[in-house]
């Protein structure tokens, strides 16, 4: 048998810092023919160094059809840790394709932190209690609805794009900003708005972690939505490890014997 094509067609499901880093690595490596797929949550995504598309696939069947029609040979899911449905769709659609999940480690509290873990945003809204508080919401636009049901607090909402007005709690302030945020910036934000509690998701990573350190310094409690249960799929923590995995897939396709060590989580 002869060798197959010298390049490996890769579909990268993105929208995260890790996906952007991996896209840059793939752009510089001639072994791969990558395509980046973005869900379209951000209204004006930054230009990417590899071919890219925006929008959904139409569920599992749509993704399966795309993979077949595009001749994809390896699928890398580097979506947000809370994009559980997309990860499930990727697993269901992959079939016999090589599939890798890139997922940054979750944050873990320090002894001085005052964290309140909750399973969802409904529980987070209830955890704020009845006494009026100044609350910083850094949770994304789709999770705001429960806080409309607890309007007694003053909300400061930080998001990449302005949320839809129908989702915003009455009287809330909107801050549009894109990370990474420095510790100095987060200190200033908490002081300027007299923040008394933060609500966030356990997204992990360094881009928005400084708010946790700033909260620790000021003794501010943080309501933290825990990650959904992770399906069993091969996974790595960053772009560099994903490139190693893709390199091994490419090598095996060329008749090499590079091992693929499963790391199920």
At which residue positions do the language-model features occur?
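SAM-dependent methyltransferases
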Residues: 2-77, 84, 94, 99-102, ...
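Conserved N-proximal alpha/beta basic substrate-recognition cap immediately N-terminal to
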Residues: 90
